[in-house]
Amino acid sequence: QRFIHPTYRPPPQPRRPVIMRA
């Protein structure tokens, strides 16, 4: 189990995934 800090904020997800860029 990973300890998540109360002040930890996940990075905002990009609107368009660059990985699926063709």
Curated annotation (Swiss-Prot):
This protein's UniProt keywords: Antibiotic, Antimicrobial, Glycoprotein, Immunity, Innate immunity, Pyrrolidone carboxylic acid, Secreted
Glycoprotein in keyword set: yes
Region (Disordered): 1-22
A GO BP entry: defense response to bacterium
Superkingdom field: Eukaryota
Residues with the Pyrrolidone carboxylic acid modification: 1
Compartments (UniProt record): Secreted
Induction: By bacterial infection.
GO cellular component: extracellular region
Tissue: Hemolymph.
Residues carrying a glycan: 7
Annotated function: Has antibacterial activity, preferentially against Gram-negative bacteria.
Assembly description: Monomer.
UniProt family annotation: Belongs to the lebocin family.
Protein name: Heliocin
Record organism: Heliothis virescens
Lineage, top ranks: Eukaryota, Metazoa, Ecdysozoa, Arthropoda, Hexapoda
